[in-house]
Amino acid sequence: MGKRRSRGRSQLLSTMTKKQKKHLRDFGEEHPFYDRVSKKEVKPQICQLSESSDSSHSESESESEQEHVSGYHRLLATLKNISEEEEEEEEEEEEEEEDKEEVDDSAVGDSEMNGEDGGEDVRVEETAESSETQDHMSLADNSKGKDGEEPPGVSQKSSEEFTDVKHESLFSLETNFLEEESGGSYSQRTSQDPFQHHINKELQEKEIQAAASSPAATQQLKWPVLGHLVFSSKFQKMETFKPPKDIDLKSLHLQKPLESTWAKTNSQFLSGPGPQKSSSCFTPLQKELFLIMNSYRDLFYPERTALKNGEEVRHVYCLHAINHVLKANAQVLANNSRRRTQKLGVGDDDDFRDQGLTRPKVLIVVPFREAALRVVQLFISLLEGDSKKKIIVSNKKRFQGEYGSDPEERPPNLKRPEDYEAVFVGNIDDHFRIGVAILQRSIRLYAPFYSSDILIASPLGLRTIIGGEGEKKRDFDFLSSIELLIIDQADIYLMQNWEHVLHLMNHMNLLPLDSHGVNFSRVRMWSLNNWSKYYRQTLLFGALQDAQINSVFNKHCVNAQGQVAVRNVPMTGSISHVLVQLPHVFQRMEAQDLASVIDARFHFFINKILPQYRDAVMSHTLIYVPSYFDFVRLRNYFKKEELNFTHICEYTQRSGVSRARHFFLQGEKQFLLLTERFHFYKRYTIKGIRNLIFYELPTYAHFYSEVCNMLRATSRGEEATWTCTVLYSKYDAQRLAAVVGVERAAQMLQSPKSVHLFITGEK
């Protein structure tokens, strides 16, 4: 009966127009104009609720096939597919707005337009404003709310998290032994293997104390592909190296079966013509990255972009991660076999110290489920290769269902920049965490964290399990023995919630609060001494140089093997991609220190910049604000001063966004406040811009040219009056160099003049 009812609802929906569906969804009933008047009198039906869902289900099957579809059922039918319909309508409305000069009045609503007062914001926006601030404030404190859950992706986290409990003994390191086929190869590699050299390195207490107080020794090198590298270390004499012209797989000490499977897994990057093809099974970029990874130094690579080399980088760090896990587990299993065959004497246990305080040894932090899916697929491919015998992957179907996506879900008419399409591909839910256990040629997905070798999670997924001070349910012991931390696409976390990343780093490699059944006779001494952070390798990948990302790398990465950072400087800048003829006025503000920059920028803006735009002649002014907290401060100030403005942020409802864009285009609102996070997640083209103010330089340099090029969307002969003003300080050196180039940025920061003019688009 339930199937018949759903068919009836779907048939009913198929006969309704889009306007009827919208009215039904908004008001819970159809418009009276479309009422179907039945000539027969319908008797009222009295329904009694059953005590259990089972009895109600059995009774419903005995009912007749014909039933009266009430307005309530029609509403439920629309709500069932509301997300899909809203997405389709949203994209269609966007396309219409991109093609037309004005927004369709029916999308805005005549009654809402007539009731809009010139000096006040839209009522719907006002009701959402109180929750906006509360939601965003709660992100940093409680990690709850809308962080990262932008309109493109809604969290799919269920109340009950699934974990695999069936295969515990099969993947246990305590009860399994090394297979004969891989046992011999392991012992042959121990002497020169960089893995063994790293974990067997013994630090002294004096070295730890000296490293805490002494500055790091640095040395700069230039590599053919990576470019300018900075080697640094606090623990040992500076050792640098240059990549050889070609490398042999055997010299890399890859664990079986990676020597044979890597070539096939990486073949997609080697099949093309030109210099990418190499006999070493690595691309030139992968070769240099893996040489640094395999030396167990920390690495910061800020040129990983989803559009250009994202998959290339993902392949090489997955190879390093699974190589590390296979070696670590092979050592444990080999020692299990040795302990079983020989009798232990007094003090012999020190020869078998091969574990940490907890089993998880690799943590991979990625922003979306799609990235986690690709990482697991790479692990399967690296273990399987050309082998005719398929490896065992438990819960694979469930994993693909929860982390995969339906290609038909994305509207075909969606037009966005290529970099947007590359980032927001597949399942973009940002709340997830999954444990992966690997034992020789078998993979266990959804393994309990304390039975896992590799943890794959988003910052939000980790934040909700780590918890905060005072919370009853919190757990971070699984982070105590992480030996390899991979943070991929770090720039996206700036658009989600960077506080989650800082919270994670503050809980890395702490002593566990519980033993979790560990055999202390097998735990390495440096782990017992709470020195795990000095043995942890951190690989940090992002698309840009940013002060917050640099701070994490400099503060939290203290690997005894040293650090390597790629420090290439942009020579041209994104301002060269501005196509419109536009004067760019860069105004430098002064601040005593980094802590006072926020207040200095605000007072400089309201005292020096804003008075120039209060005149009605300077209408159609867009103010681009990268920080949400600056946005809230400006919004409150504009309200206090009763300025004629509207605003769009990442929490504004879709209807509010449409109205704000319409009012700004028509000139009914003089100012439009726009957050960078909204632009990152939506990439709307804001029409009607004549004056542009960058309250702060954008995080992504290419956003500068994108926003500037929006001025040509509604060109009506006002090109001569267009203006662009940019605020910057000496603390914005990296962002300034990314926009104007490193040479111009140096001149602008050192010049006694505080105002600099650039003109683009000249013929």
From Swiss-Prot:
Give this protein's Gene Ontology molecular function annotations: rRNA binding; U3 snoRNA binding
Question: What UniProt keywords are attached to this protein's entry?
Answer: Developmental protein, Nucleus, Phosphoprotein
Q: Where is this region: Represses p53/TP53 degradation?
A: 643-704
Coiled-coil segments, which residues?
none
Question: Which residue intervals are annotated with compositional bias (Acidic residues) in the record?
Answer: 84-119
Which biological process terms from the Gene Ontology are attached to this UniProt entry? embryonic organ development; maturation of SSU-rRNA from tricistronic rRNA transcript (SSU-rRNA, 5.8S rRNA, LSU-rRNA); positive regulation of embryonic development; protein catabolic process; protein destabilization; protein localization to nucleolus
Q: What segment(s) does the record annotate as region Disordered?
A: 1-164
Basic and acidic residues bias locations: 25-43, 54-70
Respond yes or no to whether keyword Nucleus is given for this record.
yes
* Main location, first listed in the record: nucleus
Record PTM text:
Phosphorylated. Phosphorylation is required to promote p53/TP53 degradation in the nucleolus which promotes cell cycle progression and liver development.
| A GO-annotated cellular component | small-subunit processome
* Pfam families attached to this UniProt entry: Utp25_C (PF06862), UTP25_NTPase-like (PF22916)
Q: Which residues carry this modification: Phosphoserine?
A: S10, S52, S60, S64
Q: Which domain of life is it from?
A: Eukaryota
The segments labelled Promotes p53/TP53 degradation in the record are: 1-190, 580-642
Q: Can you say where in the cell this protein is located?
A: Nucleus, Nucleolus
Assembly: Interacts with CAPN3; the interaction is required for CAPN3 translocation to the nucleolus.
| Protein family according to the UniProt entry | Belongs to the UTP25 family.
Q: What does this protein do?
A: Component of the ribosomal small subunit processome for the biogenesis of ribosomes, functions in pre-ribosomal RNA (pre-rRNA) processing. Essential for embryonic development in part through the regulation of p53 pathway. Controls the expansion growth of digestive organs and liver. Also involved in the sympathetic neuronal development. Mediates, with CAPN3, the proteasome-independent degradation of p53/TP53.
Q: Could you tell me what this protein is called?
A: U3 small nucleolar RNA-associated protein 25 homolog
Q: Which gene encodes it?
A: Utp25
